[in-house]
């Protein structure tokens, strides 16, 4: 029996370092540090890309866009997301909804979440009402609680496109 739905879960984490722009959900957030990574290190879009690819059974972002490939150095994660989602759609799936949690001490996520939702809705061609982004802290526990990095967890629901 073919199931008409699939669920994918994505996770990513990047360290905060001075001297880099902080790009989360495709939004340039004014902050004293940015995320360290081979691409723009957009932790939210990396976790979302993994959730979509995983749900479709298409691997993960590291296989599709390896950080050992110089072609992806400094890459815009929105471009990577759109390319990955094109593969998901080519495999016969489309996104139904996205639920994301960003975990960090700072910056505050809530003021930037609406712009992140707009970007994701545009990149996936879906209704913004089907996308939810939350910000959480770890009450000063762990690396995120100490302000050393940002983590993202994303769940995505796909439905058969046919």
Swiss-Prot record:
Sample GO molecular function, one term: metal ion binding
Source superkingdom: Bacteria
Residues the entry annotates as binding a divalent metal cation: 12, 14, 46
Cofactor, how bound (note): Binds 1 divalent metal cation per subunit.
Pathway the protein acts in: Isoprenoid biosynthesis; isopentenyl diphosphate biosynthesis via DXP pathway; isopentenyl diphosphate from 1-deoxy-D-xylulose 5-phosphate: step 4/6
Marked site: Transition state stabilizer: 38, 137
Pfam families for the chain: YgbB
Residues that coordinate or bind 4-CDP-2-C-methyl-D-erythritol 2-phosphate: 12-14, 38-39, 60-62, 65-69, 143, 146
Cofactor(s) needed: a divalent metal cation
UniProt keyword list: Isoprene biosynthesis, Lyase, Metal-binding
Example GO BP: isopentenyl diphosphate biosynthetic process, methylerythritol 4-phosphate pathway
Enzyme class: lyase
E.C. designation(s): 4.6.1.12
PROSITE patterns named in the record: ISPF
Catalytic activity: 4-CDP-2-C-methyl-D-erythritol 2-phosphate = 2-C-methyl-D-erythritol 2,4-cyclic diphosphate + CMP
Similarity field: Belongs to the IspF family.
Function comment: Involved in the biosynthesis of isopentenyl diphosphate (IPP) and dimethylallyl diphosphate (DMAPP), two major building blocks of isoprenoid compounds. Catalyzes the conversion of 4-diphosphocytidyl-2-C-methyl-D-erythritol 2-phosphate (CDP-ME2P) to 2-C-methyl-D-erythritol 2,4-cyclodiphosphate (ME-CPP) with a corresponding release of cytidine 5-monophosphate (CMP).
Quaternary structure annotation from Swiss-Prot or TrEMBL: Homotrimer.
Protein's UniProt name: 2-C-methyl-D-erythritol 2,4-cyclodiphosphate synthase
Species for this entry: Azoarcus sp. (strain BH72)
